[in-house]
Amino acid sequence: TLRERVAELVGTEVAIDVVAADAVRGRVTGAGADWLGIESAAGLRAAVVPLAAVASVAAAESDLLRSARPSGRRPALAERMTLGFVLRDFARRRVGVRIAVAGNATWTGTIDRAGADHLDLALHGAGEHRRTSAVTGHRMIAYPALQTVHLDGGNG
């Protein structure tokens, strides 16, 4: 599966073409049940990309060939964690995020809550802490629309 192959690429430099957002380039840091983590080369701390949003993965030929051969290792706990689990952790830690969704919309803010199939985002400027005075609005975002979730290096 795509998830199994991406899990074999942990530590590898890749370019992820996302269906409806800008490509994400960086080092694969982990792969969960339905997401992958990237340490972004663009200067952001990290990004989470839902596997459903992945159009293609570019890597060195040797890395792609290696990913096609199962290593036989047992899945780590992180590989069983769902996207919702990861987003709930971001909500608990009050981490600032930049979220790109299908349709080329992008919002910055803090995840207030993450449910089984959607999240609530308090909108505020990048790098700002989530304070009532800084919040400019709220969005309820369905997980199937998520393309990328970048952690904000300014307030996490």
Locate the predicted segments by residue.
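Short glycine-rich, low-complexity segments
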Residues: 1-25, 29-108, 112-118, 122-156
